[in-house]
Amino acid sequence: MQLSPSEISGLIKKRIEKFDNSVELKSEGSIVSVADGIVTIYGLDDVTAGEMIKLPGDVYGLALNLNTDSVGAVVLGDYEHIKEGDKAYCTGRILEVPVGEALLGRVVDALGNPIDGRGEIETAHSSPIEKIAPGVIWRKSVDQALQTGIKSIDSMVPIGRGQRELIIGDRQIGKTAIAIDAIINQKGTGVKCIYVAIGQKASSIANIVRQLEEHGAMEHTIIVAATASDSAALQYIAPYAGCSMGEYFRDRGEDALIVYDDLTKQAWAYRQISLLLRRPPGREAYPGDVFYLHSRLLERAARVNEEYVERFTNGEVKGKTGSLTALPIIETQAGDISAFVPTNVISITDGQIFLETDLFNSGLRPAINPGNSVSRVGGAAQTKIIKKLGGGIRLALAQFRELEAFSQFASDLDEATRSQLNRGQRVTELLKQKQFSTLSIALMALSLYAADNGYLDSLEVSEVIPFESALHALAENKYAEVVAEINETGKYDAEIAEKLKTIVEDCKANQAW
């Protein structure tokens, strides 16, 4: 078979027409060392701080150290297959995670990949993990309550939507229990919740998922898990990933609550990464920017105004404010709140709930110390009825603590002192609350009203909890309309006070407990 010259030239012309002569520019570097999840790369002149670097085997690294002739990056995943001499490439992208409604009810890792065995997450939205917090001009003051359903918190240390309230205390004294109760209490309120587990056992996270599912709270919750077996890099970025997921709701005029459990372990992970990157250590071997590690995260929790939401959504959402409330958790060692990380986070947040081991061991749970606990902005957001009735509770407890110490040495006490001690004991007993037994505004108001107006004074201390249970049961069965009215309005006036008085006196008269 012979081809004519014209056929040959035709074939060549077709090949030339189909030839792709576009040039793809790649910034390429060589890996010179890999150890403990840290790679040092020679080259990559165009890399920027925080950029994702493509490594062999579909693994990415995060550029953290930019030196004159090399780049120090932390590997986000498995690094055993990476060896000296392998190539690394710039991507021109910073780390992003999937965000949106599709993540609700799911358990994801620090990169947003599902780890609950329920298939892929279908979402069209993604967001960078590092974002600049809204400026002062876009913020709105905190004036809406975020009810936790816990008597001692909502009455004495109220939390507002858009606030940062630290939960601080030693290990195993109920810090996570408070956060989980707060998430469960948001059921039916429209508040979306994100729970970020940092450096915890996988079994503990599985237990939390089970508890949330049992109480119907998983439907409005995203769980971001960086377990103890995950690399330090994933534990370091997990809070930022969770925060981006919460900002999705905040920026669209919705309310969100995020729990960081706990930021002590994130600081440990960041310290490990920094020391491996040969950054100079400072106090307690932490790097110099450990304050910025937490401040840039917690400043993203805010209440934003209508203009911000309208501008962000290009006019699709109008007249709505958005909020992201943060509950960071810090673990102390032997109650030492003057250590480096606790003092940093206390100075960043808008208040703290301080839990004490001695109170926990004495049976007071939640073990909140009302003297050390404070909410700097929550008072303006507190529900009116709880604010009015809760003031006497804090005063009664403060007087009780002072007199209790004095009464141990004094043998003869006058009637007024004895009365204050008796009331303090009963108020302390009233503030005990089991986990998963959060209260509505109306039921909490009933308990506070009974304590504030001396209805508990005639009871034995052991009768306080049974009386409260009977009071709540009576209110829900016989006075359901009053309960619904208080839950809806949250107001307090002479008429509401009279209704509360009727319910409490009815319960005392029946002695149903």
Curated annotation (Swiss-Prot):
It is found in: Cell inner membrane. Its EC number is 7.1.2.2. It catalyses: ATP + H2O + 4 H(+)(in) = ADP + phosphate + 5 H(+)(out). One of its GO terms (cellular component) is plasma membrane. The keyword Kinase does not apply. PROSITE patterns: ATPASE_ALPHA_BETA. Belongs to the ATPase alpha/beta chains family. This is ATP synthase subunit alpha. It comes from Francisella philomiragia subsp. philomiragia (strain ATCC 25017 / CCUG 19701 / FSC 153 / O#319-036). The lineage of its organism: Bacteria, Pseudomonadati, Pseudomonadota, Gammaproteobacteria, Thiotrichales.
